[in-house]
Amino acid sequence: MAAPALLLLALLLPVGAWPGLPRRPCVHCCRPAWPPGPYARVSDRDLWRGDLWRGLPRVRPTIDIEILKGEKGEAGVRGRAGRSGKEGPPGARGLQGRRGQKGQVGPPGAACRRAYAAFSVGRREGLHSSDHFQAVPFDTELVNLDGAFDLAAGRFLCTVPGVYFLSLNVHTWNYKETYLHIMLNRRPAAVLYAQPSERSVMQAQSLMLLLAAGDAVWVRMFQRDRDNAIYGEHGDLYITFSGHLVKPAAEL
């Protein structure tokens, strides 16, 4: 009987007749309280206006930009190169680098060509001077590299410049003077001389000359008041003229 009476009383009383009673939101049995967190006391006026959520924290929705970001587009056309800037001052000298590794052995070079020049000629027939000057010709070729010596003219023409050793050997004639010059072009370089004597002897002269390409070396017989001659026999070789390159000019 008491329960129906209380229900009837609650329906008949106006809103706000129970000011002392706190108002709480509905709580479900299987869910957490709603709205969550602390809440403010709701007045009868707010409840009458229907503003049940007054005093509760506001929920502001946010949008994640990363979700809305699209895919990366294609690269654009390369722009023009900008103007070159002014040249800056030189930087400080850097540290010395490490020593590199030893390189590979290179290919073998061409073989070195060594220069040679030599001649050795003789005369078997004796010769008397009749002119003021007379070149001594030769009739026997012993050594004549590259044909540089002309037997008929009695001249050696230098083709390999350098230092040469030259020697002249003759046999004097009894009671006759022997007077010869070793000539370099038109200049006497050395003399070979023997006075008249009742006995014939071997006479020699040697020297070294620096020859250039095109220089000529030859033997000249000189005529004076007395008869000038050199002795020779076909069976023996008494008169010889020789020369060879000691050192080429390229190595001087």
Curated annotation (Swiss-Prot):
Keywords, sorted A to Z: Collagen, Secreted, Signal
SUPFAM superfamilies from the UniProt entry: TNF-like
GO biological process annotation, one example: positive regulation of cell motility
SMART domains to which the protein is assigned, alphabetical: C1Q
Domain called Collagen-like: residue spans: 69-111
Tissue: Expressed predominantly in lung and testis. Expressed in astrocytes.
Protein name per Swiss-Prot or TrEMBL: Complement C1q tumor necrosis factor-related protein 8
Organism: Homo sapiens (Human)
Gene designation per UniProt: C1QTNF8
